[in-house]
Amino acid sequence: MVNKSFVWCKIPRAGLGNQLFPIANALFFAKEKNLPIYFTHYRQFKLGPYLRRERTKRKYDNFFTFDRGLIYDIYLRILLRYKSRKMSKVKGCGSISANTVYLFDEIPSWEGYFNSIVNDREEVKKLLFQNINSDILEQVKTLSKPIFSLHIRLGDFQII
């Protein structure tokens, strides 16, 4: 019998930094288990930046190679949602079952924020860079390197 399992990364509504966690975990899991991977919910309209009249609107269209446009995203959402397969939210990197959809759709909690990727940092970094569009990478190369950058929002972490 043929194993028709695959990985589905349903990108959560969050900022780009928080979206990178399920993306990175899904990419790593799919590579480790040699499974096909599908990404949905990448194109998200965020009303807040418009209401607050922010200069940047937080649109990350075409940043990644898996972003194939809104129509394809909607088509894939419908197709994946109605597949009659067992759905499994991934909590580790254990063994895989036949005909299972491995779903990555959550941002890690504050207490284990980096636990899922810390031991495989270099591989995860490599996988992320492989999935960034070449145009974006070229733009990044032209920028001067920052000396230091830090962004912490207290809404993302519990005060200890």
Q: Where in this protein do the model-derived segments appear?
A:
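Nucleotide-activated donor-dependent transferases that construct or modify glycoconjugates
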Residues: 2-13
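Short helix-capping/linker segments at secondary-structure and domain boundaries
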Residues: 5, 31-37
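Short His-Asn-centered micro-motif
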Residues: 10-12, 40-41, 152
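A short, glycine/small-residue-rich beta-strand->loop->alpha-helix junction that serves as a flexible
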Residues: 11-21, 159-160
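Histidine-anchored nucleotide/phosphate-binding helix
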Residues: 20-31
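General "foldedness" signal
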Residues: 23, 34, 51-53
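A short beta-strand-loop structural module common to alpha/beta enzyme folds
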Residues: 35-45
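Secretory-pathway luminal glycosyltransferase catalytic domains
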Residues: 46-160
